[in-house]
Amino acid sequence: MELTTKLVGTCSALDRLYQSGSAKCLFPRNSRAGLEAVLLNTAGGVTGGDRLSFSAQVRAGTRLSVTTQACERAYRAQPGETGQVRNHLSVATGARMNWLPQETILYDGSSLDRRLSVEIEPGASLLMVEPLVFGRIEMGESLNDARFCDRIEITRRGRPIFLDATRLQGGIAAHLAKPFIANGAGAMALLVYLAENAEAVLPRLRQMLPECAGASLIGEDLLVMRVLAADSFLLRQSLLPALRLLNNNEIPRCWTI
């Protein structure tokens, strides 16, 4: 799927959309936060051999918020097969990009390789979150044999300003149970906020975080937050106030349904 924004007067609008396969996109009309795009995977999830990609160009002066209609699911994969997800965002000067997908749920036996790359110009801003849930906790599922590889790269003027990589393989539940890894957490999230007011909002953000979360300023305009939680419900209790603080008290409606 490929998506490009444009300015119509003072409003952000859709300029170009290309979609194929199981990837579909909806555009709610009641959004006050510029153009909102809701991604759907009509296949219901990702399994071994799947190839999904999304690309967005957020042009100068426009505002785009991207979310998902529901949680993405990484299903059990056949041996030797891996599902691939590739997302690429390009944010021009004066533009704002909100990358706010709902949780990705890893099933036991799943194999997922995911990449997110963001090219951001000076004067642009970004709010992104990637929530992750380790198994169907309410069903008693434990990740005894799964594979998850994730890489996030944010560049400005061709230079990396944020790189993050996660690699979990095999007995993920046993690994996360270690006290100095995740102490048995069933969910986690990474949040990145790149904006001129990043330093100013950091004290307020820290005040609302639980003990199993932390936020730091790693650049003059770059804030990073990480959260661990027992399950997705508690994870959202930490994420939603943070998203409201960093996004003018707005979150996508899909997050509240």
From Swiss-Prot:
Pfam families: UreD. GO terms for cellular component: cytoplasm. Its main location: cytoplasm. Keywords: Chaperone, Cytoplasm, Nickel insertion. It is found in: Cytoplasm. One of its GO terms (molecular function) is nickel cation binding. It comes from the Bacteria. Transmembrane segments: none annotated. Required for maturation of urease via the functional incorporation of the urease nickel metallocenter. UreD, UreF and UreG form a complex that acts as a GTP-hydrolysis-dependent molecular chaperone, activating the urease apoprotein by helping to assemble the nickel containing metallocenter of UreC. The UreE protein probably delivers the nickel. Belongs to the UreD family. This is Urease accessory protein UreD. The gene is ureD.
